[in-house]
A protein has these predicted regions:
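Membrane-interface interhelical connector segments
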Residues: 31-51
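Extended, low-polarity transmembrane helix blocks
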Residues: 1-34, 53-61, 65-130
């Protein structure tokens, strides 16, 4: 009985998802962002990209700012595209490293969640609410 009434709180559910994932991505992104050039070089270099320091910095910045934007629901779909890019990079890194499914499964799961959220929108408890 109680569970059937929860659909009227779907916007609250979206808030929980946004804040939970946003905080997690900020906590993962901040150390990468503040670690400096050597970290950025490693992030970008692990993917075999040209100018690895630039791509590594962009990945770290996307992870941190994407998380922040997710929390507030501001530029929500832009944030999701940034985070999908970060997860695609993580998947690529793990596949190239030969880590197997267990190595990239978490990044794939998050990419799928972010892709789904592109269609739901941020919910009414957000800056982007309509």
């Amino acid at each position: 009985m109680v569970l059937t009434n929860l659909t009227k709180y779907s916007d609250f559910g979206l808030l929980i998802i946004r804040v939970g994932l946003g905080v997690t991505f900020m906590l993962h992104g901040y150390p990468k962002l503040t670690a400096g050039r050597e970290m950025w070089e490693g992030l970008g270099g692990g993917l075999g990209l040209p100018i690895p320091v630039v791509f590594g910095f962009v990945a770290a910045l996307s992870e941190f700012l994407g998380g922040l934007m997710l929390i507030g629901g501001v530029f929500f779909r832009v944030a999701l595209i940034l985070l999908i890019g970060v997860m695609a990079g993580a998947i690529t890194y793990h596949v190239k490293a030969g880590d197997g499914f267990k190595g990239y499964a978490h990044a794939l799961e998050l990419l799928i969640v972010f892709a789904g959220l592109l269609f739901t929108g941020p919910g009414k408890y957000s800056v982007d609410r309509k």
